[in-house]
Amino acid sequence: MDFGLFTCGYQHLPLETAFYDAKAFGYDYIELWGGRPHAFASDLLTGDASKIRDLIQKYQMPVYIYTPEHNAYPYNYMIGTEHQWEESMNYLSSAFRAASDIGAQYTLVSIGHGGSATPNQRKQRLERSLYCLCAAAEEADQTILLETLTPYESNTCTRLEDLREILDKIDSPALLGMCDVVPPFVQKEDPVDYARVLGKRMGHLHLVDNDGQSDSHLLPGDGIMPLRKIIQELREAGYDGMATIELVTNYMSDPSFYAELALNRVKELL
């Protein structure tokens, strides 16, 4: 597996710190958090993309995945008025263009909370959104990595079977599924089944630990997940690709320390 550093935890530091750390600690790539001050889509499209490309070149550290901030304020394509939906589509379409500008191959899109809409209404809205987004992604030469969230975060498409169904329905070359190990774990599903069921349509992995009763993304080894077994069985199931160690805001107090510790712990599991 290739292991990626997620830059979200570095948002109070210069972005260059994340690139420096990724190189120094032995990460293989960066998954770039698309929020301010580092890499908001409109900022990248108005000149900041060159700064990212300079960091990639300076540290010889590729950005494979761009992960725009969405599903909360102010963008969630699964909820709100028609105008708000259109703004969300425009925002994510701009994120695809920004990702291409920095040389990323993939843009990560997750499925937010659908509010009080009925299950059928949420399904229709998700399908409509993904048809629109896939067209925009193809135009920008991007591939979408579609991520399920936990039931603590979303009420739409939280399980593997939901993801398989929507991938079958949309059937776009610009759309792949992925597995964040937390949503299946808290719903008593086996994360490895994502690789078994999706096969070549599983394009990415978020690897962290969890307490089994929340959406917490914990440092590997600090939760109760059988990570060694999961990694081994993912490989046996045919998945040996990108795996971002997705440390988020829990570790912003000292992101460098935790990024190094997380990678060392994961490598001990191999």
Label the predicted regions.
Residues 1-6, 65-78, 108-114:
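N-terminal small/glycine-rich loop or linker at the start of catalytic domains
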Residues 1-4, 9-26, 53, 57, ...:
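Histidine-acidic metal/acid-base catalytic patches
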Residues 9-11, 34-36, 69-72, 111-115, ...:
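Active-site-proximal loop/turn and secondary-structure-junction residues that shape catalytic pockets
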Residues 28-29, 62, 105, 143, ...:
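Residue-level detector of anion-binding/catalytic polar loops
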Residues 31, 65, 108, 145, ...:
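Conserved beta-strand positions in the central sheet of alpha/beta enzyme cores
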Residues 33-53, 111-113, 117:
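Glycine-rich, proline-tolerant flexible connector loops at the mouths of alpha/beta enzymes
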Residues 56-64:
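Glycine-rich, aromatic-flanked loop segments that form ligand/cofactor-binding clefts
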Residues 58, 75-176, 186:
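Active-site acidic/histidine proton-transfer and metal-coordination neighborhood
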